[in-house]
A protein has these predicted regions:
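Nucleotidyltransferase catalytic core that binds NTPs
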Residues: 1-167
């Protein structure tokens, strides 16, 4: 049976989005016809222990505007995986179509440390897991820490962003 095309799925917190995230999204899009980006929700940001920078709506809206992104989906999961979201997207959108479905990952989840829940769901749904071995470009946590340090005047090497005004 001939497949109609490839649908790619990626997920991320994008809290905040940076150059490394963009390369991850662009690299995934280059390997598929349609790209769906799953945005981890605010509950997941707390579960991860990250510092909230932008809420899920802001992150969703920003990612949704990227040219490489065909569809965005706000995660329905309550843990550190997107397993339920993958299942939902597959069952509601992709199950009845003849697509190869690819789930891409990169960054802090190495090819040997793939989330087990996600891996299991992908196996059940015949979704191919592909690790994109991309160089580490930036870290959202480091960007947030750098901003906090620059605000406190603790960072010599940090230039204050132009939009932060001192009175």
């Amino acid at each position: 049976m001939n497949r109609k095309g490839k649908v790619g799925l990626v997920s991320g917190y994008f809290n905040p989005i940076h150059k490394g995230h963009l390369k991850y999204i662009f690299s995934a899009k280059a390997r598929c016809d349609v790209l769906i980006v799953i945005i981890n929700n605010d509950i997941q940001v707390k579960v991860k222990g990250s510092k909230p920078f932008q809420d899920e709506k802001q992150r969703f809206d920003i990612v949704n505007q990227l040219k490489s992104v065909d569809y965005t989906f706000l995660s329905t999961d309550k843990d550190n995986s997107v397993a339920n979201s993958l299942r939902h997207i597959h069952n509601k959108l992709l199950k009845n179509y003849n697509y190869d479905i690819l789930f891409f990952n990169s960054g802090d989840r190495g090819s040997q440390t793939w989330n087990e829940k996600e891996k299991k769901v992908c196996e059940e749904l015949s979704v191919e897991c592909i690790y994109l071995d991309l160089p580490k470009e930036a870290s959202s946590s480091n960007l947030i820490d750098k901003l906090i340090d620059s605000e406190k005047g603790k960072c010599d090497r940090c230039d204050k962003p132009k939009w932060i005004l001192s009175v």
